[in-house]
């Protein structure tokens, strides 16, 4: 579960390394986000020469969480870190590569470009 002020690792090569959650999108009183949800975030650490700079406000989709997600068959998927991919308004990633595994739940959310770029889909 990701909430306001949560710091996430960035799993793409957009230039950001770490982001801080500002808001969870999808309803006025929404507190928590899980895999496949969109957040508004601020870039806290960035690599030099990247597409995004420190202090930029970006949208990101969550691809991995430590708390995990429950699947319809009753199983759970959990990861070692909390990670997100920075996206544009049309749900395409800002970067050209995705690092680490991503959850299958992104496929139902319409993030096919992220799923196709990911090295592993769990």
Swiss-Prot record:
SMART domains: Ribosomal_L14
GO biological process, one term: translation
CDD domains registered for this protein in UniProt: Ribosomal_uL14
Key words, A-Z: Ribonucleoprotein, Ribosomal protein, RNA-binding, rRNA-binding
Quaternary structure note: Part of the 50S ribosomal subunit. Forms a cluster with proteins L3 and L19. In the 70S ribosome, L14 and L19 interact and together make contacts with the 16S rRNA in bridges B5 and B8.
HAMAP family, per database record: Ribosomal_uL14 (MF_01367)
Functional description taken from the UniProt entry: Binds to 23S rRNA. Forms part of two intersubunit bridges in the 70S ribosome.
Protein's name in the database: Large ribosomal subunit protein uL14
Species this protein is from: Streptococcus equi subsp. zooepidemicus (strain MGCS10565)
């Amino acid at each position: 579960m990701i909430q306001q002020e949560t710091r996430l690792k960035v799993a793409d090569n957009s230039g950001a390394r770490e982001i801080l959650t500002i808001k969870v999108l999808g309803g006025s009183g929404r507190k928590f986000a899980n895999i496949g949800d969109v957040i508004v975030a601020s870039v806290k650490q960035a690599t030099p020469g990247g597409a995004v700079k420190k202090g930029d406000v970006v949208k990101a989709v969550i691809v991995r969480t430590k708390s995990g997600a429950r699947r319809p068959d009753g199983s759970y998927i959990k990861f070692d870190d909390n990670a997100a991919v920075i996206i544009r308004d049309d749900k395409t990633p800002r970067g050209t590569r995705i690092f680490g595994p991503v959850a299958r739940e992104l496929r139902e959310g319409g993030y096919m470009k992220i799923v196709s770029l990911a090295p592993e889909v769990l």
